[in-house]
Amino acid sequence: MITLQRTPLFDVYAKYGGKTVDFGGWELPVQFSSIKEEHEAVRTGAGLFDVSHMGEVEVKGVDSLAFLQRVVTNDVSTLKVGGAQYTAMCYENGGTVDDLLIYKRGEEDYLLVINASNIEKDYEWLASHVIGDAKVVNVSSEVAQLAIQGPKAEGILQKVVSEDLKEIKFFKFKNNILVDGIPALVSRTGYTGEDGFEIYCKSEDAAKLWEKLLEVGAEEGLKPCGLGARDTLRFEATLPLYGQELSKDITPIEAGIGFAVKPNKEADFFGKETLKEQKENGASRKLVGIEVIERGIPRTHYPVFIGEEKIGEVTSGTQSPTLKKSIGLALIDVKYAAVDTEVEIEIRNKRVKAVVVPTPFYKRSK
């Protein structure tokens, strides 16, 4: 019997009706009310997520920048204190170790936020490539993370923060600010396609903060949300999920996050040659949106065909709560990636007609 890991908020899930599942070795809530309700709450109001299963790694020291420049694809030298950056770590062949966020807290002080299922692998990979006096410390068990997302998120969070949240622009953060008296790092980031904030605090403070936010947000209809809605929201916004759109066999260029790859930065980094070649000349595969014309929902690993030729496979798919359509993301041969290309998806041994459509499926109005 495998013992599942739990976040510091596990004991409060039941109070709000949380139904838990095994997610990559973690016992996490898939939903509280319903995935559809929670999804709609984030698109129209606000939702609160426990994302404390995510990993956090500190990188400090005089050589911290030089080290990060070597192990990530984006250009960390452009990051200023108080800024966040989305990036990837790659193997030498261009395959993806993980995608992550980097927060620059000080000139020699960075916080890396990595995917829960990759914590041990990522930490070992980082530690094995350390240079100079850079120090890498896994602080995942000490840090909790809450995400408040949606058009009403700022107004709700503002009730328990004295600092003006409007000053925190997209992909910026403030460290050591008080949220209902609790010291936290607050960043204007998220994984839903909506405006919102991610709040990092000590593990022991997480439950109090969760309860307080739901209390002050009750009037605006703030809902606790689970992994189900987190997945449908990120999927509509076409934000990649490691293990589906990204993997050791899929490069960031193929996955459509080439903006986070800077092959011309001065530093050499793992995967540079492959990624430079793909960025300049195009990759042989491309992540595209697909809409099913007939009945059926595309799911991960379902094959995609043109005639008898298998041209790729679905990475994620669902019945979109916002668009009310059956849509998917698929990694396919670039020759067939043009919008309006007609393809077929094999769903339960039956070929179903689909068409390549533009992404992102959903983009919020500013």
From Swiss-Prot:
Transmembrane segments: none
Enzyme Commission code: 2.1.2.10
InterPro entries linked: GCS_T, GCS_T_bac, GCST_C, GCV_T_N, GcvT/YgfZ/DmdA, GcvT/YgfZ_C, TrmE/GcvT_dom1
Keywords: Aminotransferase, Transferase
Gene Ontology BP term (one): glycine decarboxylation via glycine cleavage system
Matches recorded under Pfam families: GCV_T, GCV_T_C
Enzyme superclass (EC): transferase
Domain of life, source organism: Bacteria
Recorded catalytic activity of this chain's protein: N(6)-[(R)-S(8)-aminomethyldihydrolipoyl]-L-lysyl-[protein] + (6S)-5,6,7,8-tetrahydrofolate = N(6)-[(R)-dihydrolipoyl]-L-lysyl-[protein] + (6R)-5,10-methylene-5,6,7,8-tetrahydrofolate + NH4(+)
GO CC annotations, alphabetized: cytosol; glycine cleavage complex
Residue ranges the record marks as coiled coil: none
Family, similarity comment: Belongs to the GcvT family.
HAMAP family: GcvT
Chain's role: The glycine cleavage system catalyzes the degradation of glycine.
Subunit (UniProt): The glycine cleavage system is composed of four proteins: P, T, L and H.
The name this protein goes by in its record: Aminomethyltransferase
Naturally occurring in which organism (per UniProt): Bacillus mycoides (strain KBAB4)
